[in-house]
């Protein structure tokens, strides 16, 4: 198995978000890897109303810190994980995630969740996990939804 040094966890607010955070944290601890949690606020629904993206990103960090408080506390207290950070950006989700969060961090591994889109929606918008698998040069681990 590869020795991962930098792990990126893509958070989307879906039901798999905690599972993604826990899996990424476990892998980071096992490998002594730096860990970055990232989230993208979808700008498409907000483009027409002139949203304040800086405020949306700040709110996103607060929301993630709140929703994953227990997981983040455990990760930050784990001496096997050298660094932990949470970053939020606004934009088109898949592209912004890849270009503004993942590529600058240069991870060895990206951990993301399965969104569970309907067949119709998948045809029209695709999925973020599929985009990441096809476009990133590093390993991508997709955490499946539990039935």
Task: Give residue ranges: language-model regions.
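Structural beta-alpha unit
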Residues: 2, 76-110, 147
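Small/aliphatic-rich secondary-structure junction motif
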Residues: 2-54
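Aromatic/hydrophobic pocket-lining residues that form π-stacking "cages" and hydrophobic walls in ligand
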Residues: 24, 72, 97
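Gly/Ser-rich helix-loop-strand patches that form or flank binding pockets
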Residues: 26, 102-147
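A short acidic, glycine-rich active-site loop
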Residues: 54-67
């Amino acid at each position: 198995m590869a020795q991962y040094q930098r792990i990126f966890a893509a958070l989307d607010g879906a039901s798999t978000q905690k599972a993604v955070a826990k899996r990424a944290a476990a892998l980071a601890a096992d490998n002594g890897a730096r860990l970055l949690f990232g989230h993208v606020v979808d700008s498409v629904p907000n483009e027409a109303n002139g949203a304040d993206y800086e405020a949306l990103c700040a709110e996103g960090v607060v929301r993630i810190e709140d929703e994953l408080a227990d997981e983040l506390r455990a990760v930050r207290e784990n001496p096997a994980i050298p660094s932990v950070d949470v970053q939020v950006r606004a934009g088109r989700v898949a592209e912004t995630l890849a270009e503004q969060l993942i590529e600058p961090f240069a991870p060895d591994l990206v951990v993301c969740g399965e969104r569970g889109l309907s067949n119709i929606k998948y045809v029209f918008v695709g999925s973020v996990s599929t985009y990441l698998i096809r476009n990133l040069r590093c390993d991508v681990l997709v955490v499946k939804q539990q039935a």
